Amino acid sequence: MQRAALTSALCYRDAKAALNFLEAAFGFELTMLIEDNDGKLAHAEMGFGDSLIMIGNEWSQMHKSPASIDGFNTQTVHIHLDADIDAHCERARAAGFEILMEPEDQFYGDRTYRCRDPEGHFWTVGAPIRSVSVDEAEATSGLKVVKGWA
């Protein structure tokens, strides 16, 4: 797999467990696994479509899983699908993700849901369901599109 110019990396208390629940919930595929001499995960990468995510353990006082810092997060990871979002949500729920927002149609034409993994990382998952013009999006949302509407 060719590397993207930008890749997210998440840390977990139990990164090996994270590999399993990310595969079960989202269908991510383990593409790289590096262990130290004691069999502890040193680095892992999981592929999804044309993207990848890096998974690792906590490695300093400033690099922690949300599970180690009272659930606080500074980022959300977004997954873009071309599949049945409702079925995907049920798969995530069955794998142990907490569903924070059930699948819902959005003003911009996607159907999305939000979830939290067992260590507290937030994920948003969306799939396009219809094309929406700028005028329609603005009228529906009350927001002003300034740049970049596709």
Please provide the spans of the model-predicted regions.
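Vicinal oxygen chelate
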Residues: 1-10, 19-20, 26-116, 126-150
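A short, glycine-centered helix-capping/turn motif at helix boundaries
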Residues: 15
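C-terminal catalytic core of tyrosine-transesterase DNA break-rejoin enzymes
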Residues: 119
